[in-house]
Amino acid sequence: MTDTAASSPTRAAGTSWLGWLEGKLSWILLGLVGLLLPLLDDSYIGVIAQRAYIYWVLSAGLNLVVGYAGQIAIGWVSMLTLGAYTTAALAAGRIGPEWNPYLALAAGGVMGAIFGVIVGLPALRLRTFYFAMTTLGFATIVTQVALAWKDVTGGGVGTPGPTFSWPFEPGWGFYYFCFILAALATWVTANIGSSRYGRALVAIRDAEVAAEASGIAKPKLLIMVFLLAGALGGVAGGLFASLQSYITPDAFTFEMSVLFFIAILIGGRGSILGPALGTIILTALPEFAAPLVQWSTFLYAALLLLIVLLIPGGIADLLDFKNRRPLEQHREIAPRKELLSRALDKTDGRHGIVLKDIALHFGGVRAIDGLDLEIRSGEVHGLIGPNGSGKTTTLNVISGYYKPKAGTLTLDGADLPFDRPHLRANYRIARTFQTPRVVGAASVLENVMIGGTVHGQATFTEALLSLPRNRRDEKLLRAAAMQALATVGLESLADVRADRLQHSELRFMEIARALMLRPAFLMLDEPAAGLSPEEIRRLGDLIKAISREGTGVLLVEHHADLIFDICDRVTVLNLGKMLAAGTPNEIRSHREVVSAYLGA
């Protein structure tokens, strides 16, 4: 990413002080309540608030796992258990000499981080409910170890929790300690959520294939998130042990584990404010509905059902006033091709992707059968053929999603690796998809910024602490994304949620996201599908302008007129084999092509 992008005068709407206040108002109110609550001098309410803040610390980290990354971690109570027993055992001197409670709390966080990664590793391979069962199984194991390891945990009898000294001694001092740690947990997770790492997590959750095409490496990112979530869970456990004064395995119930998970869903997954509100509600509810304690499980289930049915986006959706504003009905997409020189790196010389004798079979079906194809820089290469002829499969081979049984794939004579699609971004190979792959709950601007994830320089830790290099990354990514949106004609919709766009706008938004890679080669999979004739004409002009900047374009399309109008060369596939290749005029008059595809 270059500094040129940052100098673009275009900026997202809604960045005035009023927009800033609208986004921060809920946090300001929560902060004021937290700071002023001790003035009530009600110890009962103080204990409830302390428990809410402790759960908030855990939920802040769990929100990155469940809300952002979309991993169903139901058994995250295990991190609370590990942190509680580690802190309590070290502070009580059950493992060597007695530790200072503050150091013991830090050790609880480290223990949570270690086991957070261990528990998270299966998520790299397991999906949805299989991973959920893994987390529940681990929580059961931790509880059984706590029962059996009597020398350290006290077994079923339990062990005393740590007592923190000045300035956070029991009472309102400890209240402020919990409040400060909840605020810190919220700050660091909000920093991650608003960084390229947070956008990458949401892309993995809602559009994993597009995330890979944007160069996002899922395993490394998930490990870092599980480490952070585990650490926060461990710290919450240490605080919980102190609040309880005495802990036993019975304190860490299945209902508590479900409570944390439900808090994320009720509050609104993928938001920072939502899970905090969800945690507060679910912590306070049992206290103020004590006569109905035997119905607690039923009430949790009913509340979750109501939220899912009535406000599936959670409480955070109710507070998203900006995206309730009506949009103009008759919107026009007007690309500005003159901006492409800033959005792309001019390619000098001749470069090419070459497929040689590629073969790919699915069982007995020959999806690609001995295909030869060359995509040259500065040219638009059309790929046409009947449905099932292997067009999209060819794009998937080039993009690294499929590994062929035979043949070679080279870029400028060097082999391209198969089965690692996220590495294609390193070669500046970008693509769009037959069905737009977008993050509906994110803004148009955020969706496009996902495409530039690989250009960021800040580490996960720098994003966590919002250090200068991370802030610079965000400034450059935002400017580049606004420039890409202006190029395709969507800059006025930058702050609109992507799921509010028309189909044609999603098509152009995908192209803007692909432009964020400053691609040397661009693969377009039926970009004209669902577009009006005028939109198709503008799309064709944009694609041709992209190729004139030196980018090689492979265009898979069923609109023959578009192919013949803008392509320099055309390849026709039929049943996985190349039926013909040549200029548009040659293909238009090819007898077999006319018979098999174009019609008489």
Question: Where do the model's predicted regions map?
Answer:
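Conserved structural motif at the start of ABC-family nucleotide-binding domains
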Residues: 353-355, 368
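The feature captures the beta-strand-to-loop junction immediately N-terminal to the Walker
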Residues: 384-386
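Conserved catalytic motifs of ABC-family nucleotide-binding domains
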Residues: 518
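A short, surface-exposed alpha-helical micro-motif characterized by mixed small hydrophobic
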Residues: 563-565
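Transmembrane alpha-helices and adjacent helix-loop boundaries
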Residues: 2-337
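Helix-to-loop junction immediately C-terminal to a conserved catalytic motif
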Residues: 399
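Catalytic Walker B motif of ABC-type/P-loop ATPase nucleotide-binding domains
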Residues: 522-526
